[in-house]
Amino acid sequence: MEKQYLTFISFCFSITICGFLIVSWLARSIIRNGIRTLTWRKETKRKKKNQEDENKMSLLDLPDLTLDCILEKLSPSELCAMTSVCSELRDKCVSDHLWEKHMETKWGRLMGDAAIQEWKSHVATIMRCLTSSSSSSRKSKPNWSSRFVANLKPFAWLSSNHGCENRGSSSYLAPIDSVMYWYSNLENGKFWFPAQVYNRENGHVGFMMSCYDAKIRYDFKTDTFQARYSAHGRRAAEEKVTWQRLRPSQDDTKSRDLHVSDCLHGLRPGDHFEIQWRRTKEFPYGWWFGIVGHLQNCDGVQNCRCDSDENVVMEFRQFRPESPWRRTVIKRKDHRETGNEENGFYGGVKKLGTEEEISTWKQLWPSQALE
């Protein structure tokens, strides 16, 4: 009896061991097949992805002409954003031919010869500093020039004006003598440049219908300008000067130089002109708008001979008829500065030849006559 019991126990144990081995074998087979299936699927996906990647075209794979056409359509902020994509695109996006269009569109009207010369002088000064510091840095450890360039952040205007914040400043660094760097310095107000301001000091009555030289810089937050006027004594300043009140500085005549009047013999009644005027000889000239009038003995209708007279009447019709500032008379021949300490000094004259110049002045006309 006892022998039969031991035989039964041995048989059950053998069956259990066999069952366990069978289950283990099945489990290993399932796991092995599962891993093999997963590996196959992953490999298939990888091959498919590689195939798709091979079929995709990169922007840099485009012909140069096509890529340039695309980049030319981008705004300044978009061009700046593209510089952070890769070095190849950065080199393309900082090229002058892409930025010249943006410069001309926004800043061309104000970039006269004087402003351009000012920028060239500014760049030359920076380049001299960099060259000098580069040579001196070879003798000492600190590389001042590299720190200087690294701290040039000309695209600060992007963060608040164009939504390009959180981009590394190094990706925006452009060559100092590039149009992109020039544009960026104008945009962020780093560069003061010469221009002329109509109706200075917020349209102060003493400057209505005049235009004065100033140094200006842009404020991108308000889309207006700050202006500093050069004068005898205190230096006047003004904020929130609009685009409409600005024109490029005239490089041919400095604010303290007498303009050569080569138009006097051709002036006729009704012609529009600008004339230099200053309060005293210590002050710089401003340009004042006027209209050629008739002589006192002419009725302005019949037998008018004002155009052949040796004198020419300069009228400033923004003033009341009884105002001492209403008119002055100058000689056509050998005209020099004329005037006195009471009424100021009149300088050179230039005739306005385009309708655009005349309409600009008329838009600034005061709402009521001045005293």
Curated annotation (Swiss-Prot):
Family matches, as InterPro entries: F-box-like_dom_sf (IPR036047), F-box_dom (IPR001810)
Domain F-box: from-to ranges: 56-102
SUPFAM superfamilies per record: F-box domain
SMART domains from the UniProt entry: FBOX
Lineage: Eukaryota, Viridiplantae, Streptophyta, Embryophyta, Tracheophyta
Gene3D superfamilies cross-referenced by the UniProt entry: 1.20.1280.50
PANTHER family assigned: ESTS AU081301(E20138) (PTHR31482), F-BOX DOMAIN-CONTAINING PROTEIN (PTHR31482:SF17)
Signal peptide extent: none
Pfam families hit by this protein: F-box
Name of the protein described by the UniProt record: F-box protein At2g41170
